[in-house]
């Protein structure tokens, strides 16, 4: 049984977090972001009942998978550091605590639901390709889910709610799509078309290893674009 002091501390903490949640930093269709009770951190709290990835008995809460994927990106310097995950009975109110990066990062673009373009899009797709090589597929990269370093323009990826692990042909396709979209953003549409078609032809023929070889060669070229 928890000691009375622990229960009181937990109650007071939830009261502070509830007050912070009433003044959110940002809201989306599936979550709300607000200041943590720990200075320098923020909370991302799901606004739906988290019944796991597939909603089956015994499924781990989806928030755990999301935090694990974000942690991979954070280790690569592409996402905020994950400080912790909290889950609650019935999957209601599950949340991720992470570093608040707003002091050094900013949004780009006039339309929150628009997508990165030009150099920003090249850099975002370079990161998506690096994540693909780590076996991570990250989607939903609209302007509200990407911040940029105020000094260097380096992207910082937010929101790993629409993401997953990939391997085999799916990993190749994920890498190829990120690379092709990066080429297109750099104004190399013809290169993107030929590259994508080549990789997909190999995949359709069952040549996964050769397709990955070509995908990596193209991505290496994308990485050289500044």
Residue ranges and their predicted role:
Residues 27-68:
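ATP-binding glycine-rich loop module of kinase domains
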Residues 4-38:
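ATP-binding glycine-rich phosphate-binding loop
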Residues 41, 78, 96, 154-156:
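Protein kinase-like catalytic core scaffold
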Residues 136, 149-226:
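C-lobe/activation-segment region of protein kinase-like
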Residues 71, 77-122:
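Conserved structural core of kinase catalytic domains
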